């Protein structure tokens, strides 16, 4: 599955990014599966689950016992000026650690479902899609690279934020910082499993669409098309939609918590920025730039998560559009026409969408709504604490 989709520079970097995510997840204990090269399947390993549980519990314990921000002058200055900010920050710290714990526990709990889903993706790749040319699927490579780059950016942003805010670099500080970065990396890699799986589903749907276009072109020039070919594409499309639905149900709580955490961090970051720059009358300096870069990277990562799901959903909608092209072709074989009709009816009743927790679909519309809602929460927070600002 991780073989390069071509011999170009971009494809090699894509393969390297996928392997880096795989090996990094193994090392940090968030991918508790062993690969059996003989059967080409993943097997859940209880030893890897235990290793991941102990390792990440140790990270959380080290973060709690080695707080990197406990006595920073900036933090004390902001909290002395505004007591509500201190209370909100304490609640956010508890929420962040709880989110990390729940994400990891749910990933281990759902590891059996993850194993079956990833094995089915591997089975589709090996049995049906491995012989197709993938060099034209540029969006697949692009979004894999974007996702890998976003993980690196989030990690660098955390390092810049912590190092830029701390006045002294003690051994306790570096232990806490290292544990915090490793815990963040484990969370980001765990969340990236969903997005990378969605990108693979997108690539396979893109192949189905390309094959449908080839069939349309063949029929347009009078060549014969077998109905079995159309039935196979419908079968593959049906399995891909089932996989998309299963991925959404497995990772729904994790992804909701990650997206909400990004938005909460941005709301609180802007709120603390207002206290620091306006209430404390601080001029533009390096610390303000550190705040801003963290906000920008968080928002970019949040929007990338939305755009990956939007890409897959948009490609699924294109399938219905391609099937309409068969209406312009005359004298279609009756059996083939029935297969085309079945495919069109299936697309009219089911679509490739990612529904989280029964609440919302992940797409551009939802992304804009969540961004606007977070802005309204910021306004509410400012109005509530107006006299202290």
Swiss-Prot record:
Cytoplasmic domain ranges by topology: 1-14, 68-142, 192-254, 309-366
**Which InterPro entries would you find in this protein's record?**
7TM_chemorcpt
Cite the record's tissue specificity text: Taste bristles on the labial palp, labral and cibarial sense organs, chemosensory bristles on the leg and anterior wing margin. In larvae, is expressed in neurons of the terminal external chemosensory organ and in the dorsal pharyngeal sense organ. Neurons expressing Gr22e also express Gr66a and correspond to taste neurons that mediate sensitivity to bitter compounds.
GO MF annotations for this entry?
A: ligand-gated monoatomic ion channel activity; taste receptor activity
Q: Signal sequence: where?
A: none
This protein's UniProt keywords: Cell membrane, Glycoprotein, Membrane, Receptor, Transducer, Transmembrane, Transmembrane helix
Q: Which domain of life is it from?
A: Eukaryota
The transmembrane residues are: 15-35, 47-67, 143-163, 171-191, 255-275, 288-308, 367-387
Q: How does it sit in the membrane?
A: Multi-pass membrane protein
This protein's GO CC annotations? axon; dendrite; membrane; neuronal cell body; plasma membrane
Report the subcellular localization: Cell membrane
Entry-listed glycosylation sites: 168, 281
Q: What main location does UniProt list?
A: membrane
What does the record list as GO biological process?
monoatomic ion transmembrane transport; sensory perception of taste; signal transduction
Q: Does the keyword Glycoprotein apply?
A: yes
Q: Which residues lie on this side of the membrane: Extracellular?
A: 36-46, 164-170, 276-287, 388-389
Its family remark reads: Belongs to the insect chemoreceptor superfamily. Gustatory receptor (GR) family. Gr22e subfamily.
Biological role stated in the UniProt entry: Gustatory receptor which mediates acceptance or avoidance behavior, depending on its substrates. Seems to be involved in the sensing of bitter taste since it is expressed in neurons that mediate sensitivity to bitter compounds which are also avoidance-type taste neurons.
Supply the name of the protein: Gustatory receptor for bitter taste 22e
Q: Which organism is it from?
A: Drosophila melanogaster
